[in-house]
Amino acid sequence: MNNESKCPFAAAHGVRSPATARANRDWWPNQLNLNILHQHAPASNPLGEDFDYAAEFNTLDLAALKQDLYALMTMSQDWWPADWGHYGGLFIRMAWHSAGTYRTADGRGGGGTGNQRFAPLNSWPDNGNLDKARRLLWPIKQKYGNKISWADLMILAGNCALESMGFKTFGFGGGRADIWQPEEDIYWGAEKEWLATSDKPDSRYSGERQLENPLAAVQMGLIYVNPEGPDGNPDPVASGRDVRETFARMAMNDEETVALVAGGHTFGKAHGAGDPKLVGPEPEGAPIEAQGLGWINSFGTGHGVHTTTSGIEGAWKPNPTKWDNGYFDMLFGYEWALTRSPAGAHQWVAQNVKPEDMIPDAHDPSKKHPPMMTTADLSLRFDPIYEPIARRFHKNPADFADAFARAWFKLTHRDMGPKSRYLGPEVPAEDLIWQDPIPRLDHPLIDAADIATLKAMVLASGVSIAELVSTAWASASTFRGSDMRGGANGARIRLAPQKDWDVNQPAQLAKVLSVLGDIQAGFNAAAPGGKKVSLADLIVLGGCAAVEAAARAAGHVVEVPFTPGRMDASQEQTDVESFAVLEPIADGFRNYQKQVYAVSAEELLVDKAQLLTLSAPEMTVLVGGLRVLGANAGGSPHGVFTRRPQTLSNDFFVNLLDMSTAWKPAGDSFEGRDRKSGELKWTATRVDLVFGSNSQLRALAEVYAQDDAKEKFVRDFVAAWNKVMNLDRFDVK
């Protein structure tokens, strides 16, 4: 029998698979992508829904694991020999590139999920040959199994690499759970080719080199900057501007940036031994027999002395496997001449090098090489802001070591959220401002009777249901599941910058907070035994009480879950600049958009919902409920499809799907008029109308518009509301 005809499906229907067919988005490229709300579904996780990574990690013998990692550093393998017999530089780069994709604008990227294992990151040009680092780690991952995630192991390997070469790290916190499929919610740029320069179509730059938000890298497929300079132009001063912009977008200030660049380049080398054209395809494009290994190099042995990765070739200092101040000794000790590597990349070589500063070859002890610097490295010498910082570190090695230790810890933990999420015996005791610290609970909590009393006080205070709901939503909905920042805990809505955000209606917010503050003060003064309620708790409780009252008005008796225990942060514990990035440019749940963007309002809604870890049904029921509760920013009437506002009804869906209404554009919004009389019935935004326009969302809206869905609507709204109110309650999860 012909092998090609053995499959009955292929014989009957041809040999094309469904993957070769045009997808819906190929036919309709502007179709709203709701898939990002359902990625990482339980069905994709081989460990099962009941797997508790934190519990598993807490059984790990971290000391034994670290000893195995230390041993790995010098266990050079013939299939990928270690430079100078030590893999330290490779593992530092792996950890750095795992964490370094983080960006502050939306909190996405970073090392918190082990996403370097999957496309596109596993095949980014800047991640060349990091597949080898992960293969070197596999025997250790295999040994320790589920006690250590890939995400944690990659970061820990970087720490152990530093420690094995004489550096004292600041600490390590575990707790990064792995994902099992590529992330679809992250926008990496619009370019259609790797490493596209800024003059190419769909550039991420506009105007005077203005980098598109939320991006934090200068070219598609790079972590930060082009080491050869902007678009490959070897200009150290211009490179300094790129370095500053990209590192700032990863939450690093100038001192942290200098420490990271210099500290990271204290170790290892860059690889550009041969013609890049001799390097094979990346892992995702490699043939099946390569078994996921990419960048197979046909130059010489393909590894060791013949390795080509970035195209830049050489080491920065004479002792690349030991922590010392040699990087600054070289940077300031020599003049630098522009040259090209064997791979053709721009780099700089030290002139008139002393014999003791010549660097032994990484694989041939009979050879030595002068130190090299990249264009980006030289920005630390020629940028007017970086240069004095670098010289201070050069003169004060202890300050440099401390700055690098802290910056490395921040780099590798920035996307993990509050310190309470860190696991293991090496978590530093010191609270750091970028961790968004919140005071520890220091008083007895309110009980069920107190909760009932406080609800009654809030509802009798004169603050409306709409105001209570709006305030609670504004407080809780700052949460981002991308980097676990924001949320209601801390009551930072009463502090700068959140109290002044336009979306939070500062005047109304101040009034509500004043009333709630008086209730809090009165209750705490009268409560026995030191019992207290925090303002953070009272803000959420007020919203819960309002939802219950609105449900009663619709004929439904429901109890909204409430768990006390939130605390109030101080202004001193709140970095205003750091929190500024949490200000929403749009919040479709409140029908708010700061300005017109290239991205549609409905896409911004889905993006917000994804950051809130909501499913499409949860997003749908929340929008419908918040509209009728009157939570729109500025009291806008758009989308308030009800004649009984502040009542938790399914009116939004019923009236949206009413075929007696015809919709037409009216400026930036839409008017819904009676098809027969032409009478104006409603106004709406794109966010409102998408629930009738998009086929998937309309299907969900139909469920909630049904005559038998009134109770289900209330029940589902309460569940989704409760989820958002508790997204940052890592203390009770």
From Swiss-Prot:
Under the GO molecular function aspect, what terms does this record hold? catalase activity; heme binding; metal ion binding
Family annotation (NCBIfam families): cat_per_HPI (TIGR00198), PRK15061.1 (NF011635)
What is the free-text note on the cofactor? Binds 1 heme b (iron(II)-protoporphyrin IX) group per dimer.
Where are the residues linked by the Tryptophyl-tyrosyl-methioninium (Trp-Tyr) (with M-250) cross-link? W96-Y224
Q: Which reaction does it catalyse?
A: H2O2 + AH2 = A + 2 H2O; 2 H2O2 = O2 + 2 H2O
Query: Needs which cofactor?
Result: heme b
Q: What is this protein called?
A: Catalase-peroxidase
- What does the subunit comment say? Homodimer or homotetramer.
Q: Which organism is it from?
A: Azoarcus sp. (strain BH72)
Q: Per UniProt, where does heme b bind? A: H265
Q: Name the keywords, alphabetized.
A: Heme, Hydrogen peroxide, Iron, Metal-binding, Oxidoreductase, Peroxidase, Signal
